[in-house]
């Protein structure tokens, strides 16, 4: 008896989506002359001045299927008949072009299946047509379907003479597998007890519903029964659950208000499913039982549903300039790979930090001068009424470049400062994120705090040099000060003057900023979880408002400690001393000086920095087997034709227009409808899966 293996479509790689360019088509139609050129390249028959393709020309040479020498002739003819509407064994150019157009229609998957069954090419399916194709499938060879039963008679009539049109055929094809499953149950229960054994249950599901099974479900079909016999209601509920998994996912999203990470109980999903008459409590019981068999947990989240029935999706992402896969799987993450990942993040963070600092540096200069302005006046010192007045006077007295006084040392320090902050935050978040990708709020706050503490090593020397350069222009007759002269004057220990105040500012800032950014970013993602660059910019700016404003008192104290006090100005010995003296001499409002400037500087700076950092990770993508920024790609449920378009292979440049989706669509006929055709001819032993998959 011949051994069959599945029709070889599972090897097709997933490549970028072929977007719709002609409404309502998903694929742009090929030009007639270009299509004719491709047709003539493969057409091997010439009759009466016309060229034709044979079945082998079309299926084996053009589509690249059944490349083995011992291919199944009947399967090749069946597939060629889809395009051969005249059913004369030859494909003309007009038929070749017509099928290309069919592949561009929104319901191409069903129409392709219909033409597979329309053996006479008259636009209808007869009983003989249906029976002929069904009898050639692998499923029928393993679990025969009764072609004389009541199901067939309901569709084709008692005498089996009724013809089925396209619209009716789509329903027939949908109902066929459900009926086949019930008939298989009856065949395994000849005594009519209403029960079958666990092994028979496994055999039926693997054969009749294998196009709906994931490896995790397939491996647990026996264990989910707990060794008990399977009743007919349980069997029907199980098959219904597989069919309704997309509906189950919608129920879950309704129960969690759109969150894909919330863990929910059986009672919660039962409550949410009350409005869905298609879902029964028994199906929910099986769902949780199956999820427990797969990963041994009492509650489920969206990833558990995807493990049972993965979504067909396309990835919507920014164009990648480079893509590197450092490891094959997360299990291969060595210490060296993790160091490389941190180095990669540090490099991108440095560039992002420099970009962000340059954009907002004029605002930072205004903020610093406002914070350093003491109560009362000082001879020769420019007085500012507000931030806008400060901005105008800097431009008037020092020129436009005066707004960038001290930028160079700022860039030299801000690059590693922002890099270490972003890297440490990502590193700690990675360590505190569970296997499902969830991280508690306390862990987000801790990661941000660690990031803030780590940056002080770079921030304090940078800040003290920057501040002294920024305030140097306030004295009209003052000599020009260089960054290096400030460094030599302060020395190593002097560069860390005010470090306590710096910690007092940076730790709470980052502890507030990063969790706020992550949650705001998630809220601004679209329904598919994707963040447009503008939403990243907005999330970064919004998160900067509370973070920057709430730590302004610490920033004022740090500025006063690090600036050089002029003659007649109060000097401070430490954080507590500065706090007491500022309060006594200037009142509590002095602690909030420059708040507006700080918010207007920090919010856009971090917005620009974060959007640059995440976009760089999208553009220069490296998979280290760890976590990627959320929102960088969307897992969007697609239609069968979109799935086909997303799986287009570019190996054959002759697959143009609708033919770009030909092979994936034929795979869809197999995977969606379970119409697996034998690949090898009779008497040929099947090879292993790895060797059986051809090009």
Swiss-Prot record:
Instruction: Tell me which SUPFAM superfamilies the record gives.
Output: EF-hand (SSF47473), Mitochondrial carrier (SSF103506)
- For the region Linker loop domain, give the residue spans: 311-327
- The residues listed in the UniProt record as binding Ca(2+) 1, with positions renumbered to this chain, are 84, 86, 88, 90, 95
According to the entry, every stretch annotated as the EF-hand domain falls at 71-104, 105-140, 142-175, 176-211
Q: What reactions does this protein catalyze? A: L-aspartate(in) + L-glutamate(out) + H(+)(out) = L-aspartate(out) + L-glutamate(in) + H(+)(in); 3-sulfino-L-alanine(out) + L-glutamate(in) + H(+)(in) = 3-sulfino-L-alanine(in) + L-glutamate(out) + H(+)(out); L-2-aminoadipate(in) + L-glutamate(out) + H(+)(out) = L-2-aminoadipate(out) + L-glutamate(in) + H(+)(in)
Quote a single Gene Ontology cellular component term. mitochondrial inner membrane
Keyword Acyltransferase listed: no
Q: What is known of its domains?
A: Upon calcium binding, the EF-hand-containing regulatory N-terminal domain binds to the C-terminal domain, opening a vestibule which allows the substrates to be translocated through the carrier domain. In the absence of calcium, the linker loop domain may close the vestibule, which may prevent substrates from entering the carrier domain.
The protein in question is named Electrogenic aspartate/glutamate antiporter Aralar, mitochondrial
């Amino acid at each position: 008896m011949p051994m069959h293996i599945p029709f070889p479509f599972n090897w097709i790689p997933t490549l970028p989506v072929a977007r719709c360019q002609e409404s309502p088509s998903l694929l742009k139609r090929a030009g007639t002359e270009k299509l004719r050129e491709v047709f003539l390249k493969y057409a091997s028959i010439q009759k009466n001045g016309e060229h034709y393709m044979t079945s082998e020309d079309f299926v084996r040479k053009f589509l690249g299927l059944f490349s083995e020498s011992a291919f199944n002739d009947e399967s090749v003819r069946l597939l060629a008949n889809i395009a051969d509407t005249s059913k004369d064994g030859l494909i003309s150019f007009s038929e070749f072009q017509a099928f290309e157009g069919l592949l561009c229609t929104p319901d191409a998957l069903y129409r392709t299946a219909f033409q597979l069954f329309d053996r006479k090419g008259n636009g209808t399916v007869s009983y003989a047509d249906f029976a002929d194709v069904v009898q050639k499938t692998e499923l029928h060879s393993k679990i025969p379907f009764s072609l004389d039963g009541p199901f067939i008679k309901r569709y084709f009539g008692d005498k089996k003479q009724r013809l089925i049109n396209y619209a009716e055929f789509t329903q027939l094809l949908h109902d066929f597998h459900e009926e086949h499953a019930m008939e298989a149950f009856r065949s395994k229960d000849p005594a009519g007890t209403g029960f079958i054994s666990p092994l028979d249950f496994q055999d039926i599901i693997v054969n009749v519903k294998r196009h709906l099974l994931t490896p995790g479900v397939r491996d647990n079909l026996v264990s989910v029964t707990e060794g008990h016999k399977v009743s007919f209601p349980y069997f029907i509920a199980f098959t219904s659950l597989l069919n309704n998994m997309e509906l189950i996912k919608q129920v879950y999203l309704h129960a969690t208000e759109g969150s894909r990470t919330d863990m929910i109980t059986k009672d919660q999903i039962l409550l949410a499913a009350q409005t869905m008459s298609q879902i029964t409590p028994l199906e929910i019981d099986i769902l949780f039982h199956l999820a427990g068999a797969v990963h041994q947990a009492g509650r489920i989240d969206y990833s558990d549903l995807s493990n049972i029935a993965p979504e067909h999706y396309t990835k919507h992402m920014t164009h990648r300039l480079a893509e590197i896969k450092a490891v094959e799987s997360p299990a291969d993450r060595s210490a060296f790979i993790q160091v490389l990942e941190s180095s990669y993040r540090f490099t991108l963070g440095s560039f992002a930090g420099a970009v962000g600092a340059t954009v907002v540096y004029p605002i930072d200069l205004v903020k610093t001068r406002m914070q350093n302005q003491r109560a009362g006046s000082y001879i020769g010192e420019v007085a500012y009424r507000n931030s806008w007045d400060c901005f105008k006077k800097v431009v008037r007295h020092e020129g436009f470049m005066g707004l960038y006084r001290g930028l160079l040392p700022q860039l030299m320090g801000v690059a590693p400062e922002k890099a270490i902050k972003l890297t440490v935050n990502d590193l700690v978040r990675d360590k505190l994120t569970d296997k499902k990708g969830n991280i508690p709020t306390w862990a987000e706050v801790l990661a941000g705090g660690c990031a803030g503490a780590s940056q002080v090593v770079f921030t304090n020397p940078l800040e003290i040099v920057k501040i002294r350069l920024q305030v140097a222009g306030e004295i009209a007759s003052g000599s020009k000060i260089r960054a290096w002269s400030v460094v030599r004057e302060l020395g190593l220990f002097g560069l860390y003057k005010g470090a306590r105040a710096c910690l007092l500012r940076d730790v709470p800032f980052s502890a507030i900023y990063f969790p706020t950014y992550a949650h705001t970013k998630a809220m601004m993602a679209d329904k598919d979880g994707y963040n447009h660059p503008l939403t990243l910019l907005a999330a970064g700016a919004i998160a900067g408002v509370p973070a920057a404003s709430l730590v302004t008192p610490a920033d004022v104290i740090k500025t006063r400690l690090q600036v050089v006090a002029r003659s007649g100005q109060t000097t401070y010995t430490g954080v507590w001393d500065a706090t007491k003296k500022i309060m006594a001499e200037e009142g509590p409002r002095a602690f909030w000086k420059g708040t507006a400037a700080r918010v207007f500087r920090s919010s856009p700076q971090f917005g620009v920095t974060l959007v640059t950092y995440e976009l760089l990770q999208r553009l220069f993508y490296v998979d280290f087997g760890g976590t990627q920024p959320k929102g960088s790609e969307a897992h969007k449920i697609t239609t069968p034709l979109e799935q086909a378009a997303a799986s287009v292979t570019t190996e054959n440049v002759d697959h143009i227009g609708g033919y770009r989706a030909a092979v994936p669509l034929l795979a869809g006929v197999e995977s969606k409808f379970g119409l697996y055709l034998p690949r090898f001819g009779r008497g040929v032993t099947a090879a292993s899966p790895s060797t059986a998959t051809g090009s």
